Amino acid sequence: MFWFKNVMIYRLTSPLSLESHSLEDQLQQTKFTPCSQSDMSKFGWSSPLSGSELLHFSQSKQFLLVSHKEDKLLPANVIKKETEERIAVLEEKEARKLKKTEKQAIKDDVVAMLLPRAFSKHQFTAIWLDLDAQLVYVDAGSSKRAEDTLALLRKTLGSLPVVPISFALLPSEVMTNWIAKGHTPNWLNLLEEAELKSFDTDSVVRCKRQDLESEEIAQHLQASKFVTKLAIDWENHFSCVLNEDATLSRVKFADEVREKNDDILKEDIAQRFDADLLLMTEELKLFTQKMIEEFGGIKERI
């Protein structure tokens, strides 16, 4: 099961509804296929469930998709060295300097020669659509990776009007108050890790294994620094780092959560996948609702 390790949340700006059969037909049009000998990269949809030919997994209005990207790894220095050697040989043979277009053609030939022997890097990115709440969750540690997968989904569906979720209150201000004023929600435990920034001077303080209620941290906050990253623990649910843009990184679900479905036989892969997905999505739904409450509600963008 694709237990999310990072969470980037997007809000649909106009209603989206999907039907399993029609969605599957659309996904098949942009299905992942491996790189051929002449391809540098390929990007498409793979099955979330091992052994299944379906390119999505659904539970009522919940849909899980997985994008699959393959990149051929060609070290730039290898290409450069081989290209320069070929250019030097040809220039000496013809007693002239090659044109820019001729050099590019040689480089293209070098790449074509090396591609069949290149190693591949594979990257899988899970995306969960909660159409009950009209929210989209992407398991990505960077905006680019998330946007690439959203762009693939947009291409697949024809349109996908989404924006990053935002709130009435700035998460950085709320997190700062949690520490500075002791307003930490009773469902939340602060861990000993944070990042503080001064927006006037661009100075950054990163703390690890640090008591966040210490005098040292208080002095930083009094010096107009804001909390931009905060390691938190939602007891018996999961721990993570909450960022100023309301994204979550280093998400680690508690053993109590991950072991809830251990009574399902390992051989029942589909049943266990279904149960784990329901478990994970319910946890993230609950946490999202708590964030919405703490940050003053979702801010509608025009």
Swiss-Prot record:
What InterPro entries does this protein map onto? RdgC
The primary site where this protein sits is cytoplasm
GO CC field: bacterial nucleoid; cytoplasm
| The keyword Cytoplasm appears for this protein | yes
Its keywords, alphabetically, are: Cytoplasm, DNA recombination
State the superkingdom. Answer: Bacteria
- Subcellular compartments: Cytoplasm, Nucleoid
GO process annotations (BP): DNA recombination; regulation of DNA recombination
In alphabetical order, the GO MF annotations are:
double-stranded DNA binding
Pfam families of this UniProt entry? Answer: RdgC
The family annotation for this protein states:
Belongs to the RdgC family.
Q: What does this protein do?
A: May be involved in recombination.
What this protein is called in its record is Recombination-associated protein RdgC
Organism the protein comes from: Actinobacillus pleuropneumoniae serotype 5b (strain L20)
